[in-house]
Curated annotation (Swiss-Prot):
GTP binds at residues 59-62. Displays ATPase and GTPase activities. It holds the Pfam family RapZ-like_N. SUPFAM superfamilies: P-loop containing nucleoside triphosphate hydrolases. It comes from Clostridium tetani (strain Massachusetts / E88). InterPro entries: P-loop_NTPase, RapZ-like, RapZ-like_N, RapZ_C. Belongs to the RapZ-like family. GO terms for molecular function: ATP binding; GTP binding. The keyword GTP-binding applies. ATP binds at residues 8-15. This is Nucleotide-binding protein CTC_02495. HAMAP family: RapZ_like.
Amino acid sequence: MRFVIVTGLSGAGKTQAIRSLEDLGYFCVDNLPPTLIPKFAEACYKTDGRINKIALVIDIRGGEFFDNLFESLNYIKDQNYKYEILFLEASDEVLVKRFKETRRNHPLSSGGRILNGIALERSRLKEVKDVASNIINTSKFTNMDLRQEITRIYGDGDQVEAQLTITVVSFGFKYGIPLDSDLLFDVRFLPNPYYIPELRNFSGNDKPVYDYVLEFNQTKEFIGKLNDILEFLIPHYTEEGKRQLIVAIGCTGGRHRSVSIANSIYKLLEEKGHKVNIDHRDIHEDNNKGGKKL
């Protein structure tokens, strides 16, 4: 089991660090009182490996509870529970700038003076910093820089950034666009199988409709261009730390054209090794209804 205790100066990036650890598959707990660490560690170690990556944030917000940190750490060490301490810090100048940008008060500031709070916190955390397994100074870090450093230290072996999950959603404009879509494409310019009597009652999941939609040159050209766009965007989205990409394909009713195109794009992405899901949101809707959906 890997048991990571995240602590450090307020404003140094503990929230971003715990989010990054969560993306790496860690079970995360924020602001756990140090007095509860022994029981928490014991419970985790009793899961027989079901939980094998733990991260928890301990910081000065715990008030007087924070003074019990070393007592708790000594106890779990005596129980042969292994742990690591990640300490985050930054320069005074950067911390002041971050607090002013967020318009938040430092938890230890006296009379509203941020620098006073930073100085007091540095003093109180010195002993913790001295025994930290890893110290990261985030003064010159972007969120992405910190994420990459966390991945380097706490990822599994050669683990890289978590893979982007792509969800291809087909939908009908008459029921409203998917509110969570990142990229949205309108395929109502394609020939509509709805007006072919023998195809009307089928959907884009059925071969007759799928073949009909994809037989047109404009369909083939569109799929090719859309595939090119996605192959260009996906690496850049991944590099910027995006974890989910919703690609919405819409036609009038969400049963024929959008389903066919979504299925085609899904297959192309899957064949290229992308982590991809598909959701035909409106495929079972009665096309005579006009209710809006999310």
